[in-house]
Amino acid sequence: MSHQPKPLSEVEHIKTQSRLLRGSLAESLEDPVTGGLATPDTNLIKFHGSYQQDDRDVREERRQQKLEPDYSFMLRTRLPGGVCTPAQWLVMDALAREHANHTLRITTRQAFQLHGVIKDDLRPTIARINEAMMDTLAACGDVNRNVLCNPNPVDSRVHETVYQWAVRISEHLLPKTRAYYEVWLGKEKVAGGEDEPIYGATYLPRKFKAAVAVPPLNDVDVFAQDLGFIAIIEGDALVGFNVSVGGGMGATHGDAATYPRLADVVGFIPPEQTLAVAEEVVKIHRDFGDRTNRKHARLKYVLEERGVPWFTAELEKRLGFPLQPARPFAFEHNGDRFGWTEGHDGRWHLTLHLDSGRVADRPGAPHLTGLREIARIHTGDFRLTANQNLVIAGVTPEARDAIGALVTAHALDSFRSASPVRRNALACVALPTCGLAMAEAERYLPTFVGRLEDRLRAHGLQDANLLLRITGCPNGCARPYLAEVGLVGKAPGRYNLHLGGDARGQRLSHLYRENIDEDAILAALEPLFEGYARERQPGEGFGDFVVRAGHVPSPAVQPRPS
């Protein structure tokens, strides 16, 4: 009996016919009849760094009025390692006020997002981003996304070297099509000879995420990435990277064939082999990823189903050289270090806490204005963290008092007073703009944290470094499956409760309760907090406790898909 191959997903056909990501984007942008794009172009624009969205708070009202959805666009920058200059910050600040919803958002991939950009403003907004020596190319889509890197230059000069490798990886894996420059920047079409040497005409089966980590901090959650480079430092020198492959957070409710997965460390390489390894890992995803089912298309499923030994052998065959054995390393924490720290060169770095990465002017908290004023006098740079916070980096000793005064005057000093659970918490955007959200996340986080703080305080745990993450759907943009307490949206006001991750980003959590509301979540946590307060060992985190006490399975017995 012959087996017919499964049909390709619809997006694969769109990419095939797109002429290297051009599609009919130019025509869609000029169409005055609608605030949206032609359906195929809504997929293609992701590669250019944007998502078409609509305001779900008014979707039903507009439907009843026989109006099209209230379309707008989210724009995301490509900003390797999250480093930007004060001048670039001021450009993003101006665009947020002129063309977006008067807010900036720092993402869990160290990038800026603008929300609420209307179709007619897309071209001028993208043009100004490019004029500021940034871009949005490959910030979304079936390509390598923004490359993460430890954002804080405190520890050593090696951190700057590692950051430069993150930039080189990002540039090396950038799509080569001229479509972006033609559609958005008015560049002339070049006749013939265009190809995609790494991606091919249909790019990857799904998104690809890469990160560079510098132990002992795992602030980029390297094991949640498709590809990770873990810096190995001996003395004051970078000697190479351990390579990790096959991580990913996304899953689908009710589909056992989809699941979060931690990456596997497959070996060690010297720095000069970094770009070759990055390219060949991407090509393996290109050639073996599932193009028939986008929910099953990430690289992690290739490793899970074919096995790590197969993957390593395939990678070494393509490279033409073997990987060396992985070298020892240790992670201590995956959070940020708040407040002032002095760097190796005598300059100072101030890490600010931002709720869910949102920079806005709110009553009593004019953060957007405050950071604008800081950018006008700052001579160092800004570093966006993968925990949605911000480092004002490279502050001279002479400027420290002035920067500190602006921070205080604009209520940017919450890192001093916020509880550890509030400082460490992450949330995705979710409603009202994300089309995938099943429940609230960013808008709900402050309320839930407040109630959680009350329960922790009742048990004397107000200083516990609890790691909480909330996402509005199971795709896991805020990496909830690595949290000690993770809420994953299931329906309006209802979440799956995951417990048992750790504060090092090295252990997946376990589903503890399914489809429950806030009261039930707090009721489920109450006896665990009581036990943790009574029985925890010195230095033991909450996630470690719930595993040790048997409330959730340990990783050794946690079921894995077969």
UniProtKB/Swiss-Prot annotation:
Documented EC number(s): 1.8.1.2
PROSITE patterns per the UniProt record, alphabetical: NIR_SIR (PS00365)
Membrane-traversing stretches: none
Alphabetic keyword roster: 4Fe-4S, Amino-acid biosynthesis, Cysteine biosynthesis, Heme, Iron, Iron-sulfur, Metal-binding, NADP, Oxidoreductase
Pathway named in the protein's UniProt entry: Sulfur metabolism; hydrogen sulfide biosynthesis; hydrogen sulfide from sulfite (NADPH route): step 1/1
Catalytic reactions on record: hydrogen sulfide + 3 NADP(+) + 3 H2O = sulfite + 3 NADPH + 4 H(+)
Keyword Amino-acid biosynthesis: yes
Assembly description: Alpha(8)-beta(8). The alpha component is a flavoprotein, the beta component is a hemoprotein.
Protein name as annotated: Sulfite reductase [NADPH] hemoprotein beta-component
Species, as recorded: Myxococcus xanthus (strain DK1622)
